[in-house]
């Protein structure tokens, strides 16, 4: 039986990546909140990843 989470790095980046966040007003709000809070990673694009990305 197939479960819900079928990880794909491309889909993850396109949905939650920096460019996706910057594309909408709400996404820019998300980024500003995370900057204000002092998050180490603003988006999934900031993760330290291997060659697959």
From Swiss-Prot:
**Chain spans, region Disordered:** 23-53
Name of the gene encoding the protein in the UniProt record: rpmH
Q: Which family does it belong to?
A: Belongs to the bacterial ribosomal protein bL34 family.
Organism this protein belongs to:
Leptospira interrogans serogroup Icterohaemorrhagiae serovar Lai (strain 56601)
- Name a GO molecular-function annotation: structural constituent of ribosome
Q: A Gene Ontology biological process annotation?
A: translation
- This protein's UniProt keywords: Ribonucleoprotein, Ribosomal protein
Could you tell me what this protein is called?
Large ribosomal subunit protein bL34
The record's InterPro entries line, in alphabetical order, gives: Ribosomal_bL34 (IPR000271), Ribosomal_bL34_CS (IPR020939)
């Amino acid at each position: 039986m197939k479960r819900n989470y079928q990880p794909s790095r491309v889909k993850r980046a396109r949905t939650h990546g920096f460019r996706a966040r910057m594309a909408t007003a709400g996404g820019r709000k998300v980024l500003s909140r995370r900057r204000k809070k002092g998050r180490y990673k603003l988006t999934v694009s900031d993760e330290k990843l291997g060659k697959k990305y």
